């Protein structure tokens, strides 16, 4: 057909592809891609095959036949006349032109016509002069069919001059995709080469061999347009053509570059994988070749680690280097550099360098001795390597040598052994190991083989031709001086002392003997398999036995490490008593002790120490001469190498070459410090430092995180700074291998800027010493500055920056210059510098009013980077400013002449001083103050974790509570205090006495309050005494905050929870003469304790009566009074003995000693040990002052610094970060897998029960039509994300039944296979407890049901497939689910919707709004928990009717119908309930705890004295840093999870009295210290001792017309870390405890009143929800009550005054609480602290108090 088509073109007078080429042209036009014939595409190969059938090249051709060209044929057919190209487009070939040009037209005749629309390719039209495809031809260069015989003859006269001609050139294929362009370019280049245009193709360097002509360029342009349509070109090609649409050469050049890069990577990988080295080339050249390849691959993103590189190198070693292949078995961490050290050592020995270098080789492994033999084809060879190295050796490379070779002696000739070096000796006994031993200094006695990998065994060696043994004990028929030459792998001689027989007695009672050689110079005893084979014994490594050819097993083989061993117990000992080898006898007394023996004897000390000790006779019994020191020089103790392993030593002055090689700012060191925890969000948590290698100039930058973009911004900033300010370019940056430095983003940035990253080696921080030392220095300075200034820790980076400025200006002792001078900068002008933390007054340029003060006190931090100002911290505004408008606050001394820091008083609490607020002292006095505060996000309780501050004993002796201070003393001391302001230090000076910490005598008038009523004992005691009483020495450890100056802001309401008795001197109302109140007795003082709440005032201003200073809600009607009395009447409160109104409990009787760890987590709180009174400090004390010494704020205010916020001091608390927010407890697996329950279960009876349960579950699954049984799917056909794994789980229930369940692995389910919005609801525990309580009060019947395989009743909407369990033998198949299988994410929600719909539609139930899974109708209440149902009804028939309806649809089992009138026992959701209708209900978990607690492996004391309380008051948890390894830490955390998990389960079920202890310990799950574990054990022990306790409910009195729902709240102020308070609530329904909660307050409270408000506000939402539930389930009216023991809180709730709140957070909370109380008709009542049962939720109590508060509701 092709011949016919071509015959239609008569106008073509030339052959279509008949150009020839000379041999010279063939060789010069070389392919730059070097594409071999094997790499040609399939269509090229097909073309080759087709062309090979045509006429071959004439024999006269000087060039071998080119399979890509066709030979010219005689012109037997006229040329075609009607071709697509006119005759004038053809060129006459008068030279070696490209083959087949006639198809593409004469290039000179085609003009360079630009594209009409854009410089892109468009298909040419029929009138275009550009070539087109012939419409009837498949390709533009179709080859004529061989059968047609139609050929074309080249008419060019130049063809006769050619030595060879080409066949028809096959064109490239059409480009069909941009992704195929790289492969297409290869074929296009091949096409150009075959067309005699190889010379114009760009070479590797991007330049062609010759210049392209215009004709060739036209041809190139036309052919590229034909075969590469524009729509299939890559973007980068289109970009080139958009600039110059004829620039095909640039496209080819760039394509070749891309292919060269890809080819180079492929070639490097192939070269690296096929490395070969045998020593024929220099080792340096081989190393350079390999390292260059690895570097190129690493730079191209192909990372080759040391392990892979070493394996590839060792795989190619041969000859003398072959043994290095096996080093990887003993040295897993070998680097490429270490491997090349071994290769260099062997190469040097081959080159004859033994005379100039020590005759030993580097040991491939410094950790183990190894002995292994390899087969040699020429002579027997035994490899024996026993690397030894002295401890004090300075050699960098230790090389393998056999033990008998001296360190400096030349190697022995391989062919013979010098007999002169061997002197025979007599064998004294059969245990003598010196049989024929050479008496040379290099001899080492191996009497002790404790270094063997497997002592008492022989190493099986397939490569050893002889058996060698070190001990003569098993040698039979021994003879000395054998004429045997044995060499090791390095062809060094191994001296042989004797030869004999080795006799075996195997376990089948057969005896065998082989020849054995004796030498003490090997590491292991070698048993040659070749010699065993000679006596018909082979080693079977599949069975690991020695056996005969007939299969008889002789002995087992032990695999230890990488080798196989046979026990020596099969060897027969020698029966030669005293054989005489020669007539030479060595006396026992002349034998020297071997050094290895002495080395081990003397605790592995080094040789130098041992020799020195022997010389000085510090070791007796033998002398230095009694030890053989010959091997001490090169001895390497394996135990020392392992036990004393250290990092490589850094050579002193090793960085001098960098300092000399680089100019300033060309070599930088950088490192990151952080994070610093417990800081506000606005403060940085990290900083990154930079140090210049040459000048030592330093920079620091703050960081809030370590993200890639944050690090990149800093690098961009510093590089631009160095470039612009110092006109330098950074060349190298040294850093560690942290992810912030090794990420791809930073790597590309450095590469783009031409910077070389220099990383440290793994775990080698010393190599990064410059940056590490800088960070350490800056942190030391930071701690010092913060300690000295007393500034808050969130300013820590300002201290770092201040230190950096100073350090850059200090001269180095070595260079005698500062970093600034090295950098060419001027010295630091100290007149512009202020001490860090210098008090200043800053001008307020924008005051609130014209009469507002213009000055704001602040603290100077450091000079500004961006201006000539100074960075100053303003505590009152809680921000820093950059300003020059400041005045230094100076004392008598200059700021530069030892500024007197002690002239300033620094208080601890920033929030209270700066917050201006309205407060009142009495109902008729309210004082206003200006407020300079602006709210910010600073958390001023944050702390920098730098180093622990050790507590100090402040007072040398305890202060007697009966001592007092005379008034005169106060006056004198007050005068002294007024002269010098005292700064409250972090650690109080032990020299401070009681007198000089008293407040100043000079005070402004303080109003005197009379008729103050105390509520210390729960009653009202009128105190007609002044507010401020004199201070006695007994209270010197308390704060003197009660006395205030003009602004008496801190006098607030008073409650009973106070122990800080404040007795200080006061001023009269109208004058300046101070008078003190006469002293009163301790008893009177205790009566007159006045309790203050510093932040929320509890006194109502609208009532001036002295009887209502602490208001309680006064009933206005008799009904209200009766309501409040009725709320408290039926509660299970303790019965207290009546007390006399004049008696007051001594608050100091059970007060624990002052503890320095008062801010740590406590199971006792801060002073919470009083049995009757909650002893909570109302004011925060200095954290580091264990005696709570406080300085009056008037001392601070004496210098008009009332608005200045004194910095606070805090002590670091060592906590793991995760401890601070433990949100959940990891569940503990209680089920068994299939293999555990059935396959490997050794308990036959249990196994049978599990098998029975398994078959029952399978039948149930098939019965429920869980999956599609008609079709099984191939795993390859299904989308993997729709495939869910499955498994069987087994467990034994509490009733003893064995359960099997087929579940899906929902934990690895893909998110696309379920709706995350669906919810799986279960009944809330409070709903269950409420239903049970109402059932008791209303004589309900309780029926318990269970629905079998509940989830399987719910259909599944999604298309999901599961893998059958592995034991079913269907590994490659899948089954499609139809039902909601257990374990799927959506199964619970599907079942909930299914059962909910059925209960509503079929059973006539409705779900209670707001309480999921609680359904009701007029007669029945249902609580649903997955497949468990609990029915409550007054009529049992109503329950039965529901059961009948359920059985119509579901397999419903009746667990307990509840029809008996006697006591009925239930097991409902883990609770063991005893219920007698109309009388009582008891809830417990005795059986469950009896079963579970012993399985926790807790050291119980079952027969010892039982614990009476779960914890001790006053006990604090020490939170020092844990020093345990990772495995032990994980083990202890896992143990804590189990223990606290069980305790939480029990506590929230019914043991509400344990919730405080559980909550406190749960916060320390990730801090499992010994103390925490002991406390946890104590809690579990108490649970064990009281496992029989039950929550007791009694039926409500029938006379009660209403339901009463009560919440009792309590709070323990500031007894948790970071001043957090513990809050607790107990909920009661009709006098029955139904729930409880104990938790740490989310907000930081500043007083007990705020804590109580927080506690009550937390209880109200749940109280309202429970109220709604009770009203839905029982239509009786409901009375709701809130009980608290804080009268100040009640006063705030019932008051309408909005000026009481100084804090907007608690003000908002209190205002909302007011609205909720009034809107929900809540009755707020007062309860005495001694009767507040919620007290157990907030603090540990003494045994007596704990029992008193709990014995009425749980016993």
Curated annotation (Swiss-Prot):
Residues 1338-1476 form the Reverse transcriptase Ty1/copia-type domain. Its main location: cytoplasm. One of its GO terms (cellular component) is cytoplasm. One of its GO terms (molecular function) is DNA-directed DNA polymerase activity. One of its GO terms (biological process) is DNA integration. It catalyses: DNA(n) + a 2'-deoxyribonucleoside 5'-triphosphate = DNA(n+1) + diphosphate; Endonucleolytic cleavage to 5'-phosphomonoester. Residues 1038-1053 have a biased composition (Basic and acidic residues). It is found in: Cytoplasm; Nucleus. Residues 1610-1752 form the RNase H Ty1/copia-type domain. Residues 153-165, 402-418, 960-969 have a biased composition (Low complexity). Keywords: Aspartyl protease, ATP-binding, Cytoplasm, DNA integration, DNA recombination, DNA-binding, DNA-directed DNA polymerase, Endonuclease, Hydrolase, Magnesium, Metal-binding, Multifunctional enzyme, Nuclease, Nucleotide-binding, Nucleotidyltransferase, Nucleus, Protease, RNA-binding, RNA-directed DNA polymerase, Transferase, Transposable element, Transposition, Viral release from host cell, Virion maturation, Zinc, Zinc-finger. The record marks 401-402, 582-583, 1217-1218 as: Cleavage. A motif (Bipartite nuclear localization signal) lies at residues 1178-1212. Mg(2+) 3 binds at residues 1610, 1652, 1685. Residues 299-401 are annotated as: RNA-binding. The active site is at residue 461. Residues 1-23, 48-60, 127-152, 1005-1015, 1054-1082, 1101-1111 have a biased composition (Polar residues). Residues 1-88, 126-173, 352-421, 956-1087, 1092-1111, 1130-1171 are annotated as: Disordered. Initially, virus-like particles (VLPs) are composed of the structural unprocessed proteins Gag and Gag-Pol, and also contain the host initiator methionine tRNA (tRNA(i)-Met) which serves as a primer for minus-strand DNA synthesis, and a dimer of genomic Ty RNA. Processing of the polyproteins occurs within the particle and proceeds by an ordered pathway, called maturation. First, the protease (PR) is released by autocatalytic cleavage of the Gag-Pol polyprotein yielding capsid protein p45 and a Pol-p154 precursor protein. Capsid protein (CA) is the structural component of the virus-like particle (VLP), forming the shell that encapsulates the retrotransposons dimeric RNA genome. The particles are assembled from trimer-clustered units and there are holes in the capsid shells that allow for the diffusion of macromolecules. CA also has nucleocapsid-like chaperone activity, promoting primer tRNA(i)-Met annealing to the multipartite primer-binding site (PBS), dimerization of Ty1 RNA and initiation of reverse transcription. The capsid protein forms a homotrimer, from which the VLPs are assembled. The protease is a homodimer, whose active site consists of two apposed aspartic acid residues. The C-terminal RNA-binding region of CA is sufficient for all its nucleocapsid-like chaperone activities. Integrase core domain contains the D-x(n)-D-x(35)-E motif, named for the phylogenetically conserved glutamic acid and aspartic acid residues and the invariant 35 amino acid spacing between the second and third acidic residues. Each acidic residue of the D,D(35)E motif is independently essential for the 3'-processing and strand transfer activities of purified integrase protein. Retrotransposons are mobile genetic entities that are able to replicate via an RNA intermediate and a reverse transcription step. In contrast to retroviruses, retrotransposons are non-infectious, lack an envelope and remain intracellular. Ty1 retrotransposons belong to the copia elements (pseudoviridae). This is Transposon Ty1-ML1 Gag-Pol polyprotein. It comes from Saccharomyces cerevisiae (strain ATCC 204508 / S288c). The gene is TY1B-ML1.
């Amino acid at each position: 057909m092709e011949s016919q088509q071509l015959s239609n073109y008569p106008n073509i007078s030339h052959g279509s592809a008949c150009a020839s080429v000379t041999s010279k042209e063939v060789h010069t036009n070389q392919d730059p891609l070097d594409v071999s014939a094997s790499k040609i595409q399939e269509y090229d190969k097909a073309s080759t095959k087709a062309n090979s059938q045509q006429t071959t090249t004439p024999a006269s051709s000087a060039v071998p036949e080119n399979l890509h060209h066709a030979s010219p044929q005689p012109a037997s057919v006229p040329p075609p006349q009607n071709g697509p190209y006119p005759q004038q487009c053809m060129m006459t070939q008068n030279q070696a032109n490209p083959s087949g040009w006639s198809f593409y037209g004469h290039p000179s005749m085609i003009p360079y016509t630009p594209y009409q629309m854009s410089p892109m390719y468009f298909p040419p039209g029929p009138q275009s002069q550009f070539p087109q495809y012939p419409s009837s031809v498949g390709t533009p260069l179709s080859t004529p069919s061989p059968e047609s015989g139609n050929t074309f003859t080249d008419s060019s006269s130049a063809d006769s001059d050619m030595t060879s001609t080409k066949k028809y050139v096959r064109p490239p294929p059409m480009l069909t995709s941009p992704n195929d362009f790289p492969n297409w370019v290869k074929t296009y280049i091949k096409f150009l080469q075959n067309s005699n245009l190889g010379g114009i193709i760009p070479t590797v360097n991007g330049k062609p061999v010759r210049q392209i002509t215009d004709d060739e360029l036209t041809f190139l342009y036309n052919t590229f347009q034909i075969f590469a349509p524009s729509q299939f070109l890559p973007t980068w090609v289109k970009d080139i053509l958009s600039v110059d649409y004829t620039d095909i050469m640039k496209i080819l050049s760039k394509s070749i570059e891309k292919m060269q890069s890809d080819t180079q990577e492929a070639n490097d990988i192939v070269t690296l994988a096929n490395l070969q080295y045998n020593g024929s080339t220099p080792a340096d050249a081989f190393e350079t070749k390999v390292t260059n390849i690895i570097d190129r691959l690493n730079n191209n993103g192909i990372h080759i680690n040391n392990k892979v590189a070493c394996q590839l190198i060792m795989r190619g070693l041969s000859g003398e280097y072959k043994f290095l292949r096996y080093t990887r078995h003993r040295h897993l961490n070998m680097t490429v550099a270490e491997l090349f050290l071994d290769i260099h050592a062997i190469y040097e020995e081959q080159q004859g360098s033994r005379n100039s270098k020590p005759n030993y080789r580097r040991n491939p492994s410094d950790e183990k001795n190894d002995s292994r033999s390899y087969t040699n084809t020429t002579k027997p060879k035994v490899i024996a390597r026993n690397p030894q190295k002295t401890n004090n050796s300075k050699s960098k490379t230790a090389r393998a040598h056999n033990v008998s070779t001296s360190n400096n002696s030349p190697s022995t000739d391989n062919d013979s052994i010098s007999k002169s070096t061997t002197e025979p000796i007599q064998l004294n006994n059969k245990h003598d190991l010196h049989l024929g031993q050479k008496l040379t200094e290099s001899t080492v006695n191996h009497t002790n083989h404790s270094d063997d990998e497997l002592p008492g065994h022989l190493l099986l060696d397939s490569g050893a031709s002889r058996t060698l043994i070190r001990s003569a004990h098993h040698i039979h028929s021994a003879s000395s001086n054998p004429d045997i030459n044995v060499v090791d792998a390095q062809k060094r001689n191994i001296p042989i002392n004797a030869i004999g027989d080795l006799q075996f007695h195997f376990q089948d009672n057969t005896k065998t003997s082989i020849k054995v050689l004796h030498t003490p110079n090997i590491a292991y005893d070698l048993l040659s398999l070749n010699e065993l084979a000679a006596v018909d014994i082979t080693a079977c490594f599949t069975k690991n036995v020695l056996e005969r050819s007939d299969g008889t097993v002789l002995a087992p083989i032990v695999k230890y490490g990488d080798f196989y061993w046979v026990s020596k117990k099969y060897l027969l000992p020698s029966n030669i008593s005293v054989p005489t080898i020669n007539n030479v006898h060595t006396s026992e007394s002349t034998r020297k002790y071997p050094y290895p023996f002495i080395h081990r004897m003397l605790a592995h000390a080094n040789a130098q120490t041992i020799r020195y000790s022997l010389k000085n006779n510090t070791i007796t019994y033998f002398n230095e001469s009694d030890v053989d020191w010959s091997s001490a020089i090169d001895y390497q103790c394996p135990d020392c190498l392992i036990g004393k392993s250290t990092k490589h030593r850094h050579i002193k002055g090793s960085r001098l070459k960098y300092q000399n090689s680089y100019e300033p700012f060309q070599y930088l060191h950088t490192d990151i410090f952080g994070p610093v925890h417990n800081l506000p969000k606005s403060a940085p948590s990290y900083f990154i430092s930079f140090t210049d290698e040459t000048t030592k100039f330093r920079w620091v930058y703050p960081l809030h995180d370590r993200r890639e973009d944050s690090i990149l911004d800093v690098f961009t900033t510093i590089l631009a700074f160095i470039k612009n300010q110092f006109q330098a370019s950074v060349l190298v940056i040294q850093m560690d291998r942290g992810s912030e430095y090794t990420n791809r983003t930073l790597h590309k940035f450095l590469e783009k800027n031409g910077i070389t990253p220099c990383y440290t080696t793994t775990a080698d921080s010393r190599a990064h010493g410059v940056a590490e030392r800088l960070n350490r220095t800056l942190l030391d300075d930071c701690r010092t500055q913060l300690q000295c200034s007393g500034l808050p820790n969130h300013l820590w980076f300002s201290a770092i920056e201040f230190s950096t400025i100073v350090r850059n200006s200090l001269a180095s002792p070595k260079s005698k210059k500062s970093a600034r001078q090295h950098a060419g900068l001027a010295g630091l002008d100290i007149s512009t510098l202020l001490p860090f933390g210098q008090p200043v007054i800053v001008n307020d340029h924008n005051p609130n009013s014209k009469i507002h003060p213009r000055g704001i006190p602040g603290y100077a931090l450091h000079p500004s980077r961006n201006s000539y100002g100074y960075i100053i911290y303003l505590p009152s505004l809680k921000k820093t400013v950059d300003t020059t408008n400041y005045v230094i606050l100076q004392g008598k001394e200059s700021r530069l002449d030892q500024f007197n820091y002690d002239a300033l008083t620094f208080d601890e609490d920033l929030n209270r001083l700066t917050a201006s607020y309205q407060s009142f002292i009495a109902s008729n006095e309210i004082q206003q103050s200006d407020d300079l505060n602006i709210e910010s996000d600073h958390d001023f309780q944050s702390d920098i974790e730098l180093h622990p501050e050790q507590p100090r004993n402040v007072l040398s002796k305890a202060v007697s509570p009966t001592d007092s201070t005379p008034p005169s003393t106060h006056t004198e001391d007050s005068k002294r205090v007024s002269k010098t302001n005292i700064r409250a230090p972090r650690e109080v000076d032990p020299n401070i006495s009681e007198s000089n910490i008293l407040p100043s005598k000079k005070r402004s008038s303080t109003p005197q309050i009379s008729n103050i009523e105390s509520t210390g004992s729960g009653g009202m005691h009128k105190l007609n005494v002044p507010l401020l009483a004199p201070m006695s020495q007994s209270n010197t450890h308390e704060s003197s905050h009660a006395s205030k100056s003009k602004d008496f802001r801190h006098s607030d309401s008073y409650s009973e929870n106070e122990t800080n008795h404040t007795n200080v001197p006061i001023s009269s109302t109208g004058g300046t003469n101070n008078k003190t109140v006469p002293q009163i007795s301790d008893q009177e003082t205790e009566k007159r304790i006045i309790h203050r709440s510093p932040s929320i005032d509890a006194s109502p201003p609208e009532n001036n009566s002295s009887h209502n200073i602490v208001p309680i809600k006064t009933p206005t009607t008799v009904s209200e009074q009766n309501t409040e009395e009725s709320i408290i009447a039926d509660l299970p409160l303790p019965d207290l003995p009546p007390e006399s109104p004049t008696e007051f409990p001594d608050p100091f009787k059970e007060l624990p000693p002052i503890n320095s760890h008062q801010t740590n987590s406590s199971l006792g709180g801060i002073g919470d040990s009083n049995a009757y009174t909650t002893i909570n400090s109302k004011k925060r004390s200095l954290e580091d002052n264990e005696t709570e010494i406080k300085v009056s704020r008037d001392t601070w205010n004496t210098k008009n610094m009332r608005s200045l916020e004194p910095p606070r001091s805090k002590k670091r608390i060592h906590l793991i970060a995760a401890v601070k927010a433990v949100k959940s407890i990891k569940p503990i697996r209680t089920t068994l897998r299939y293999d555990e329950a059935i396959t490997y279960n050794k308990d036959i009876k249990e196994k049978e029960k599990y098998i029975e349960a398994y078959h029952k579950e399978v039948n149930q699954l098939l019965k429920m039509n869980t999956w599609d049984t008609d079709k099984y799917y191939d795993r390859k056909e299904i989308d993997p994300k729709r495939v869910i794994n499955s498994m069987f789980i087994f467990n034994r229930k509490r009733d003893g039944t064995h359960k099997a369940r087929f579940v899906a692995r929902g934990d690895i389910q893909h998110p696309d296979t379920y709706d995350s919005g669906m919810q799986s609801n279960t009944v809330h525990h409070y709903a269950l407890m409420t239903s049970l309580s109402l059932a008791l009060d209303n004589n309900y019947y309780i029926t318990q049901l269970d629905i079998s395989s509940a989830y399987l009743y719910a259909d599944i909407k999604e298309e999901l497939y599961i893998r059958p369990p592995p034991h079913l033998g269907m590994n490659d198949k899948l089954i499609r689910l139809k039902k909601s299988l257990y374990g799927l994410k959506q199964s619970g929600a599907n079942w909930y919707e299914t059962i909910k719909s059925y209960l509503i539609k079929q059973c006539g139930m409705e779900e209670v709004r707001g309480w999921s899974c609680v359904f009701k109708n007029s007669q029945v209440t249902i609580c649903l928990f997955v497949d468990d149902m609990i029915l409550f009804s007054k009529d049992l028939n109503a329950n039965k009717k529901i059961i009948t309806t359920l059985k119509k649809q579901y397999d419903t089992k009746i667990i307990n119908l509840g029809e008996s009138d006697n006591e009925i026992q239930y097991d409902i959701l883990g609770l063991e309930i005893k219920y007698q209708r109309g009388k009582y209900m008891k809830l417990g978990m005795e059986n469950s705890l009896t079963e579970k607690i012993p399985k926790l492996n807790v050291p119980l004391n079952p027969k010892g004295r039982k614990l009476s309380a779960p914890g001790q008051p006053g006990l604090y948890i020490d939170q020092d840093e844990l020093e345990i390894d990772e495995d032990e830490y994980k083990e202890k955390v896992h143990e804590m999870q189990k223990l606290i998990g069980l305790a939480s389960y029990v506590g929230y079920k019914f043991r509400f009295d344990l919730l405080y202890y559980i909550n406190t310990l749960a916060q320390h799950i990730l801090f499992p210290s010994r103390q925490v574990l002991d406390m946890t054990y104590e809690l579990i022990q108490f649970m064990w001792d009281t496992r029989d306790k039950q929550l007791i409910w009694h039926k409500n009195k029938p006379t009660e017309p209403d339901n009463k729902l009560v919440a009792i709240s309590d709070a323990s102020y500031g007894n948790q870390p970071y001043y957090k308070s513990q809050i607790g609530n107990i909920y009661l329904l009709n006098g029955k405890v139904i729930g409880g909660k104990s938790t740490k307050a989310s907000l930081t409270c500043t007083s007990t009143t705020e804590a109580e408000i927080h506690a009550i506000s937390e209880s109200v939402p749940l109280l309202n929800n429970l109220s709604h539930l009770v009203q839905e389930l029982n239509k009786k009216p409901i009375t709701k009550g809130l009980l608290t023991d804080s009268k100040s809180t009640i006063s705030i709730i019932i008051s309408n005054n909005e000026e009481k709140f100084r804090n907007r957070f608690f003000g908002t909370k209190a205002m909302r609480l007011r609205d909720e109380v009034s809107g929900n008709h809540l009755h707020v009542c007062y309860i005495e602290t001694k009767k507040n049962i919620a007290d157990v939720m907030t603090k540990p109590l003494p045994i007596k108090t704990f029992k008193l508060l709990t014995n009425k509701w749980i016993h």
